[in-house]
Amino acid sequence: MALHATLDAVTARIRARSAEPRAAYLARLDAQSRRDRGADRLGCANVAHAFAGMPGNDKLRVVAERARNIGIVTAYNDMLSAHAPLQHYPDVLKDEARRHGATAQVAGGVPAMCDGVTQGTPGMELSLFSRDVIAMATAVSLSHDVFDAALMLGVCDKIVPGLLIGALHFGHLPTVFVPAGPMTSGLSNSAKARVRERAAQGLVGRAELLQAESAAYHGQGTCTFYGTANSNQMLLEAMGLHVPGTAFINPGEGLREALTRDAARRVLAQGCPAIGRVVDERAIVNAMVALLATGGSTNHLIHWVAVARAAGLVIDWDDFAALSAVVPLLARVYPNGAADVNQFQAAGGPGYVLRELLDAGLMHEDVLTISADGIRAYTRLPVAAADERLSWDPIGDSTDLDVLRPAAAPFSATGGLRLLQGNLGRGVIKVSAVPEDRHVVEAPARVFDTQADLQAAFQAGELDRDVVCVVRWQGPRANGMPELHKLTPPLAVLQGKGFRVALVTDGRMSGASGKVPAAIHVTPEALADGPLARVQDGDVIRLDAVQGTLDALVDAQTWAARVPARPPVSMDEANGVGWGRELFAGFRRNAPGAEEGACTWL
């Protein structure tokens, strides 16, 4: 089918907007590609240092036999359940490389933090900027410059965007991303959320809450809700940077190792394209479409702006909004529905979604991927024979229409994310998880300086009414733009009581957040004299996700005359002290706004 006119138009304006930086980026790639291989180009001492730690046979291959050498960048640690399976991946990949006459080295490791561990703590204020630390660590790893290809081992929220940003700065290298897959299903996400809401009301204690949380998060692999980590995997499939169909295979399955080995084969294959060529404006648009069609994480309205910039491309929220108006919602996965990602995979998974979008003219088909068979390869399901040989089978109809629907009969005719703008600035809302009767909320404001203040007001019973909770001083420059996911249970309790409730903030919410209408990423942020600094208790605020507006219903003269508030001195000082936050002062000081991707490296 012909490409949808809106996709064509959005892609064309991104191409035009990005002409100068993209040309400079590609010129840099061409210059890097024309050089001799590292082991031939570097001095003898450099080469000796580079390969001194290798087994003897590998040294012979890479130096004397001029074998191709893969650089592995790993985000392994066993703090993250999603990354624990990565521990032994380098050994598997090295073995597979040797089978094909090549070598592989762990070029370096990057940090990986778990937002589930740091939610509601000072550590969460390092979260967003850890993406750029990961990008820098990826660049440091690859800066040894003795690699002919690269493999990126990572899964979670900031890790994949950080690895991708770093890899794009070495965009002349063929690069494949290697995931670990989701943990098997435990306590359902809906049941877990109900226990959290009961705990917020004091109806259950710590022991029962811990039991529920441990039953939900019970083993190795990605969390099973469709948050930022699993959205990462969907977007990598849509961009053709995975082995096809590898996103949601559980860590314990035999198929998982077969796919991991195939990543090494793919990156060594003759003609595997450089990642900087794969990630062009068409691939970025494909990722945006996949995000919208699945109701993915709002965090990617920040992260993929940064990813695009790393490839010399400029996108903005208007591009997302234009696409959202024509991209249908095809998936209902928690928090957008009851199913988890294992049920999503069983119903047809990413391959089903990509096939439906391609057939509807809602994705670019003329793109490069790490598969020689192009993007259509990602519409098939991998299977392994007894001898571990891989093949890919066609995906039929959705096996569960409560989870996945065809483009001709979607859950919604439009995407799961919306742009909001008005006299409070520009922000975004994830509507796919919000009941339709809550898409418009108009109520008096209650202004908070911290999420702890909101929690205290809830516990004191001060919010048992229609209310729009404004939580400010949560932007990139204020305190690193933490996720405020801990606010979901109390706000959900208020909504469950029948009150019309919404959140407005310059901070972020987790990819797992939903249910309660939340205007997030509001920019300019309050610390930059953004409009949220003018809001006062009692101002009536209207959040309208139908019309795409976000306004304080205050007359223009009064609004203009208000002097923007400043954060309390005590809070301003506390935000930068302790728990390593001092080390990120330069990041906060230099960060642009959320819509610019909060890219501290520009």
Predicted regions and their residues:
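Acidic/charged coordination and interface sites in well-structured regions
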Residues: 88
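N-terminal small/polar loop signature for handling phosphorylated ligands or for N-terminal nucleophile
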Residues: 107-145
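A short, small-residue-rich loop immediately preceding and capping a beta-strand
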Residues: 141-163, 174-178
